Curated annotation (Swiss-Prot):
This is Proteasome subunit alpha type-8. Belongs to the peptidase T1A family. It is found in: Nucleus. GO terms for biological process: cell differentiation; meiotic cell cycle; proteasomal protein catabolic process; regulation of meiosis I; spermatogenesis; ubiquitin-dependent protein catabolic process. GO terms for cellular component: cytosol; nucleoplasm; nucleus; proteasome core complex, alpha-subunit complex; spermatoproteasome complex. Component of the outer alpha-ring of the 20S proteasome core which is composed of 28 subunits that are arranged in four stacked rings, resulting in a barrel-shaped structure. The catalytic chamber with the active sites is on the inside of the barrel. Interacts with canonical subunits of the spermatoproteasome, including proteasome activators PSME4 (also called PA200) and PSME3 (also called PA28-gamma). It holds the Pfam family Proteasome. Disruption phenotype: Knockout mice were obtained according to the expected Mendelian ratios and showed no obvious phenotypes with respect to viability and development; however males show infertility. PSMA8-null spermatocytes exhibit delayed M-phase entry and are finally arrested at this stage, resulting in male infertility. Transmembrane segments: none annotated. CDD domains: proteasome_alpha_type_7. Component of the spermatoproteasome, a proteasome specifically found in testis that promotes acetylation-dependent degradation of histones, thereby participating actively to the exchange of histones during spermatogenesis. The proteasome is a protein complex that degrades unneeded or damaged proteins by proteolysis, a chemical reaction that breaks peptide bonds. Required for 20S core proteasome assembly, essential for the degradation of meiotic proteins RAD51 and RPA1 at late prophase I and the progression of meiosis I during spermatogenesis. Keywords: Differentiation, Nucleus, Proteasome, Spermatogenesis. It comes from the Eukaryota.
């Protein structure tokens, strides 16, 4: 039955489904896991990094990028689709700044991206974008923001969220571990993001891409060495906690 309705983007199935949009959401579920955490004075983005070929330049396969000085984005899904969305969003950021002489708010650029995605769900000769995005940054009020969009064009604000292949596992971890204490300072928020990714990344820090953004500061990408140091500290704390637990039990 589905095959009669899954070819045209603009045709609903009898039970109310847009199959092409659902297929785009499946493409997202096959993408690298990405996590976003909104701290008190910081927003952290982390992405599961796939291993690259020995001769490939790692800088060309990043899943985290800046849209403007105060807004950045991580995505899961089709990289080529993301490139188009990122390019459109960057142009809109600059156009808005030239027109009204103020930078975009994080919600404004999120709504722009969501609207762009929605248009591609009801236009002939196009297909939906196969990406979900975590869009983060700071507005003039200094409050950190985190939004998530999906291929259907919806968007929501979050305290913490995950997208991609293992989003369900990471989200469950965040629901258990995201507390005010866990984001009380910048370092704890960074650790929480890494811990969440370590739930699904098997080979430790070398397969994690991490970035932070603070108020009035540009996006900061962590080097592989910095990530390894954070992972080592997390593992050391975990070992100490287990030793303390075993002593109490005896």
């Amino acid at each position: 039955m589905a095959s009669r309705y899954d070819r045209a983007i603009t045709v609903f199935s009898p039970d109310g489904h847009l199959f092409q949009v659902e297929y785009a959401q499946e493409a997202v579920k096959k993408g690298s896991t990405a996590v976003g955490i909104r701290g008190t004075n910081i927003v952290v983005l982390g992405v599961e990094k796939k291993s690259v070929a020995k001769l490939q330049d790692e800088r060309t396969v990043r899943k985290i990028c800046a849209l403007d000085d105060h807004v950045c984005m991580a995505f899961a899904g089709l990289t080529a689709d993301a490139r188009v969305v990122i390019s459109r969003a960057r142009v809109e950021c600059q156009s808005h700044k030239l027109t009204v002489e103020d930078p975009v708010t994080v919600e404004y650029i999120t709504r722009f991206i969501a609207t762009l995605k929605q248009k591609y769900t009801q236009s002939n000769g196009r297909r939906p974008f196969g990406i979900s995005a975590l869009i983060v940054g700071f507005d003039d009020d200094g409050i950190p923001r985190l939004y998530q969009t999906d291929p259907s064009g919806t968007y929501h604000a979050w305290k913490a969220n995950a997208i991609g292949r293992s989003a369900k596992t990471v989200r469950e971890f965040l629901e258990k571990n995201y507390t005010e204490d866990a984001i009380s300072n910048d370092k704890e928020a960074i650790k929480l993001a890494i811990k969440a990714l370590l739930e699904v990344v098997q080979s430790g820090g070398k397969n994690i891409e991490l970035a932070i953004i603070r108020r009035d500061q540009p996006l900061k990408m962590f080097s592989a060495k910095e990530i390894e140091l954070e992972v080592s500290e997390i593992e050391r704390e975990k070992d100490e906690a287990e030793k303390t637990k075993s002593k109490k039990s005896t």
